[in-house]
Structure formats: C-alpha cells, structure tokens
C-alpha cells in the first residue's frame, strides 16, 4: 500500500454539516499485514469527522485533488459504486434497525487479496471501537491499517473486519463506508489457529462447598480490575504461560506414552476414572463430542482480554485448577499436573521433595509405596525433565496437602470483604511485611496448587516490575490509600477460630475493617503480590496459628493521627508517642473534664434578634442533662470559659446544645453538636485532655477542651500536704483539730442544701462551674465557720453539691473501709427478705464497727441521702441512681497490692475495690433498711452529730442507737 494520493472534500455553507468526504488510496500487490507489538495508535475514527480534523489531515498529508477517474489503481467502477452508495439511502436505516449494524455491500477477489465494501450504521453517540494507524509498525510508515478494536467493540462482533485489514477508502460522517483489503490466506491462518486451541484440562469437578462463590473463576464477571493495567498484565502472563504449557504438556504426554514408565507416571483422568488417551468402550464413541463441546464453550474473561500489546488474543477456555485436583472414586495417591494460575509463582524443579509432612500420616502411607531401605516413600514416580522443568506444577491430592495453607499464589486480583474506608493519608515507607501479609479467608481456595512454601515465591524481577516495565514504579503509585487500606485491613479470625484468645491485643482498625465482611473492591491485586512489591521480601504465611501474646499495633495505623471521623480534632504530627490502639473499654467511667471555651459563627434566629442577644450552652452525657453555662452575648463573642467536672458511669456520647436566653420568653434551641467520647481519647489514650473544634448544626463551631480521669486516677486517696487544710485531710485529725464530731465543712454544706430544699431537680446530677467551686472552696479552707453560704452569695446549689462530693472523694480513706464492705457483702447473703428489723439491726451492728469519726460522718451522710429519697418524685433521684453517685465516694479506694476478703474461711468473693456494681448494691442495701431521721431537741448518747453555726444547731438522732 502506498501513501495517500489525493482526496476530494466539499465544504458546505457555515453551520451545515459537511458532505461525506472520500479518501482515496493507491494499492500495490505486495502488502505486509504483520503488525508490530509496539505500535502507536494514530487516532480514533469512530465518531463523525469535523472540519478541523479534516483540515489537519489535509495539511499533514499535503495531498492534491484526485484524478477524474478515481485515481490510483482503484477501478473507476468501484469508485462510482462507492459514491453512489454513499449518496443513496441506507437500507439498514430504512429498516429501522436499532443500534449498530454492518453489512458487506460489495466483495471481489484478485488472487489472494479480497476487497470488501463495508457499510456501518451506528446510533448517535455510539463508539465503534475501531482504531486506525499510519503504517504497520514494522516496515511501513505510510498507509492506513486497522490497528485494534476496543473492549466490547461492535465491529469485532460483526466479524466483517479484522486486525491488519488495509483501509482503502474511508467515508464519514453520515454512515461509515470502509473499502478494506486483506489477504485471504493470512485471515484463514488466524481463524484456523483460533479454532485449533483446546482446553488444557478435560476433567471438570463440581464443588458444592459453602464458599462456591469464591471458587468461581476470579474474573468470570467483568470487574473494575479488568480495565486496569495490572489486570490486563496478569491475564497476558496467563495467556503466555498457557501457550508454553500446552506445548510442554503435549511433549510430555508423547514421551510418557512411548516410554515403559507410563504405567507409573502421573496421568490426567476424566470423570469415569479412565486415563486420558486410553479409549474405553463407553467413552470412545463420545470422545469427539466432549472434545468439541469444550472447544465451543465461551471463554473466560481471563483469556478474553486485549493484550497490551498486541491488542487482541485468541479465545480459549482456562479453568480453575481447584476444580481438577482430584476425581471422585479415584485414588489420589499420585500427583496430577495442571496449569499454574500465573507466572508469578513457578514451582521449583524438585517436586518430589516438596510433599508435605501430612503425607506421612499412617492413614495415608498405604496409598504410596514405601522403601524399607531408605526409610522414605518410594520415588517410583519418575522425575521426567520435561515435566519437572516445565511450567506445569503438581497438584497434590487433598489428603496429602498441609491443613494450614499458609502460602498461596496470590497473583490475580481477588474479591474480598471490606467496609467503608477512612480517607487518611498513608506513607509508603512505613508499611512492613507483617502488616501486609495478614490473614485472608480466600487463601485456601485461591490457588490450591501451591500449598508448600517454595511454590509461592516471587522472583526478584517480578517483585518490582508491577507497572509498565518500570522497576521504580510500584503498586503504591497505582492504587489509592483508601483502596490499599481496605485491602490491607487484617482479617478478623474470630469467624474461623472463635473469639480472640485471652491476652491477645487487637488494634482499633483491625476491629473496624476485619470484623464486618462486605465485598472488596476489585481494583487491587492479591495480598501476596502487593506485599512483595512494597517490601521485596519472601511471602509470609497467610494463616499463621493464633499466638497468645501482645503484639504491637499495625505500623500504618500509627500514622492515622486524626481520632474523629469528621475531622473534629486537629491533626497532630506523627511521632513515637502516637498510639491509636483500640481502647480496652467500650465506655468511660470516671471523671469527665469539659471546658467550654467559646462559640464561633453562632447566630441567633431572626425571630429572636429583637428580643435577646444572649445565649448559653447545655451539656448532656448519654442524654442526661449534666451541666449548663452562664449566658454570653455576641459582644462578648460567646466566650463562656467555664469548666465542669462530671462523674460519669459507662458514658459514650456527649451532646452540646446552644439555647437563646430570655427572662420572660421560652428559650429556643439554636445550635447542637455531638461527640463520641471514645473517639476523642483514642490518640493519647485516657487520662489526658485535648481541644476540639466541634462542628455544630446548622452552622458554627464550639471550642471545647475535654479530658478524662479513670477510677484508678480519681480514687488514689492521697493526703493533703497542707497542715491547716480541710479537703484531703485524714478524718480523725480534722475532727480532733476542730473539736467536733463531724467536720464543719461537711456539716454546713449538707445543712445548706437541706435548707434550700432537697426537691431541686437535678440535685447531685448537675455539675456546678469549677471556677465558682474553686472560689468557694478557697473561702472554706481559710474560714470554715465564717464563709457565707446563703443563696445571695452562692446562687447555684449545684456548686455546693459538688463540694460535698469532692470532700468525700478526697478523703485519704473511704468512710466505709474494705473490711466493713466485706462484712456488708456477707450480710447481704444471709439477710432475710421479710424480716426488715433483723436486717436493720445486723447492718447497724456492722456500721458500729467503724472508727468513731468515720461512723459519725457516715451517719450524717446516710441521713442526708435518706432525706433526698423522700423527695424522689420531685428531684428524680431513685435509689439506684443515687447509689451510682455516692457508692464510689463511700466505698472506693485504690488498692493495687491485694484485695480484701471477707474472712479467711469465707466463701464470698474478694472485695473489688473499684467495682461499681458491687459498691452500688451494698449502698442500696443500706438505704433500703435505713430508718428515717427524727429531729429531737433533747440530747442523746447517739454518736450522731450536731452541726452548729454560731451558737445554734440542729441535732440529728437516729432511731436505732449504735
């Protein structure tokens, strides 16, 4: 074929589509139709041509007008026929055919060359998938050749065109007219070679296991991986290896049939235990039928791929080797040979030495001959060099494989389970092999032919050549961090091995990505290929036995430095101190420190702008109202600057609400936001604080500082070093210094609350401001008797209630010691449900065993709690809720040396010093039998206290004297 001689182009008026243009080419007898693998694509001519493209082609070709006769060696009648057909109406269009249609209008033959005039009609916007190029890429730089067809090309399905057809005339845009030329013998050879290919394996085993979905061909359904470079490269390697293996297998079969050793050589069998190649009475008549049936089956998508390059491969049927490893009713003592899945895992030459140790099982030894001289299995199976040196690999029978399939070929993409990934940046230089070669459930069925460790080794060249021949570009540059993280998430083995063994640590991310199993993205390669491309180390076992020991958290997890899903927390620089291990608790129990700094971007609703400009913030923990700030205005920039110490039990979520305030009108909700407490403390673990910019709805942000101290940090029970202090001083020293039965501070605070009324809603639940509490505490430390506690000076009753809890919490020793607590637990086991008086006497006798100072304070507190329970319908404090508040204050103390037991011979369990449920149950038992308080003017020998302010006081006497 010679270059373009001329073209005829008619330009219409402005705004009108051009008439079909005709490109005329001159032909010569000898045409090379061979295409080089490294061809370049000239342009895609599947849509309507434009004036710009025609002008560019005209300038590049520098062509002239064609001669009147049609030009070149093309006959004039052919040119006139093409022009007439182009200007006429299409019969395909008149027939109303939808979609793309193609037909041959004219065909003639000159010797070995065939000329065809092809008409193609397509609907608007449809791509034909036809690629043309200049030159054949080998010895011709001019002329137009059909380079290749795209994926799912309509032209390829019509079978009217083929690769390397020479385009003589191209007419567009109304309909596509192609005058093509091809060699009849060349196309016949291509068709013959395609039809002569046969399946490698003729035995098909059906498996009815539960994981049949994963047993299906990996690429049986088109996925996103099929369109990626890695997927095409993998299928290309499979096709090359299949061609090489077919030749080697045919040679080996010929050698084995002609050799006397063929009685012992491994053979392929069919479904009726008949060796292939040995005809039988039942199979001889149907052998041709089976042979043709397998040849006509639709090919898998593994082999139906466009080579990169060449663009198109012949179709063939490649079955999964899992389906051919054994046959029913056939002894599986001899290994069978079949096609490996890919060239990334070629077995070593020594096959006999790779039999796993499971073959030495006494139940299996009878299947293989045993050599008494060598003490090993007899090696009567020949090691034919054609078999051992080829690309065929042995498939050991299922009974001879290792139960722990630790190394599997993982060169092809797999469908795996995933969840929604986190969009967190990750680094390529911090990923180790141990983090990548994790457990994966599909390994046992992905490539069962490679069950021994040497079978799944990648070569050094393959480890770093996972891109277009570039050793420097790895999978890191191909796939995103989110896809990699979803793929690399360690598999949660609890579904296979049960729950985690005791003491084994699990990371927060492994629980998130490994427990829930959902379809995995198919745009990633197998775990083995990606791991070796990143690290360059041998493949590690994918199913290691569970080890009961603490393991460090995944390295790439340490660099996920944002603790929140929606980025409420600022990112912190990664360092050795960052630890994002999943917290060992599912909720928080202790003291929650919340510092509400200010609000940003807050706006009052339009309806209330004329009424008020003041707003306040409300804090809820697990949907319970726990704190409230004062009011602030927009002139103050909504800077509240208030701190709250909230005692929480099994807290998980905190909610923030911003209300507008008005003394007469109803308060309106303006903004709201929520924060998961466990996510807030995941970076630095517990017992620390950090600042968050909490996003509010519908707009604005709330700047808060949140900290937490667990029970071990709260109830250390240390002594106040101040000699004249009041809080944190041993109780005996304090009452001795003050010469009172009970501490003055505790007595005055309780009296003030009862004076204001115990029916206040949220009493001991709402928290007062820490700033106001510190001011009142400083006054009580300096002058316990002279401090003014009236409502004018301290309007917030919650501040006084918080000081009572602080006083009991900071005592060096709890009011109820662990020994007395153990006695109460034992009394609960012997208490009679119907004898209230006997139970009361027993409990009071146990309390009488306390020290005098502790007993007097306990009586004061219990009488106060009993009074609060009398107003339970008003204040909302039930015995259970009140016990959860005061049980830690009365019972808890940190004792890490040894737990207290009830008695040396007691059958009761040890007293757990920080057990909330145990302490709450004990306090509920005491409150259930505690007598109501009676005011008495007369004196008594009761150890109950009489608190005094100035010269007067009120005496509290219990009915039952201790």
Curated annotation (Swiss-Prot):
Q: Name one GO molecular function term.
A: GTPase activator activity
The UniProt entry, under CDD domains, shows: C2 (cd00030)
Cellular location(s): Synapse
| Domain Rho-GAP: residue ranges | 729-923
UniProt-listed InterPro entries: C2_dom, C2_domain_sf, Rho-GAP_regulator, Rho_GTPase_activation_prot, RhoGAP_dom
- Give site residues, Arginine finger: 765
Q: Name one GO biological process term.
A: cell differentiation
List residues of the C2 domain. 572-696
Q: Which Gene3D superfamilies match?
A: C2 domain (2.60.40.150), Rho GTPase activation protein (1.10.555.10)
Spans annotated as Disordered: 231-367, 397-419, 437-471, 934-962
Keyword field contains Hydrolase: no
Record field: compositional bias (Polar residues): 243-261, 323-345, 401-412, 453-471, 934-947
The terms describing its cellular component in GO are: synapse; synaptic membrane
Question: Which terms are listed as keywords in the entry?
Answer: Developmental protein, Differentiation, GTPase activation, Neurogenesis, Synapse
Tell me where it mainly resides.
other
Q: Which PANTHER family does this UniProt record tie to the protein?
A: RHO GTPASE-ACTIVATING PROTEIN 100F
User: What is the protein's given name?
Assistant: Rho GTPase-activating protein syd-1
The scientific name of the source species is Caenorhabditis briggsae
